């Protein structure tokens, strides 16, 4: 799998797909004008990786300051794909980073974590 880096814009997060190191990072704000065009290739790349090497596992770091409902759906698709792969025996860890005073993002992290059964989901608060 080819590693990829997508620089952040004012509406799209920084995305690091470092499959060779079994690592993905999403950082910034996520409310792209065309959510399908932005998230689709990322989700497809992840699913291709999981098809090739799901047993290897992966770490996903999410440090989003804001996301819209379309991005929430894409995030759920990503998390579900990782959870399904974890069910097959891979070691998958999701780290959800949010600022300690951002209760909304903490609650989103809690809601996402409740929908997963097999992947490890950690919520970490960051000091401002």
Q: Which residue ranges define each predicted feature?
A:
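A short, well-ordered alpha-helical element
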Residues: 12-15, 31-56, 75
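N-terminal amphipathic/basic leader segments beginning at the initiator methionine
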Residues: 1-17
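A cross-taxonomic marker for long C-terminal extensions/tails that follow the last structured domain
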Residues: 6, 111-128
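Secondary-structure boundary motif
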Residues: 48-55, 84-88, 114
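Short, aliphatic-rich beta-strand segments
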Residues: 22-28
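Amphipathic alpha-helical interaction surfaces in cytosolic regulatory modules
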Residues: 37, 42, 62-112
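Residues at or immediately flanking beta-strands
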Residues: 57-61, 91-93, 120-122
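Helix-adjacent hinge/juxtasegments
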Residues: 49-59, 65, 70
């Amino acid at each position: 799998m080819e590693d990829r880096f997508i620089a952040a814009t004012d509406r799209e997060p920084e995305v690091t797909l470092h499959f060779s190191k079994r690592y993905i990072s999403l950082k910034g704000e996520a409310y792209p004008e065309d959510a399908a065009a932005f998230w689709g290739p990322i989700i497809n790349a992840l699913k291709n990786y999981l098809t090739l090497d799901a047993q290897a596992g992966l770490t996903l770091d999410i440090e989003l300051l804001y996301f819209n409902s379309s991005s929430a759906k894409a995030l759920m698709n990503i998390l579900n794909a990782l959870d399904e792969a974890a069910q097959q025996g891979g070691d998958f860890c999701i780290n959800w980073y949010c600022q300690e005073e951002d209760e909304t993002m903490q609650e989103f992290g809690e809601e996402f974590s409740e929908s997963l059964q097999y992947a490890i989901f950690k919520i970490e608060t960051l000091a401002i």
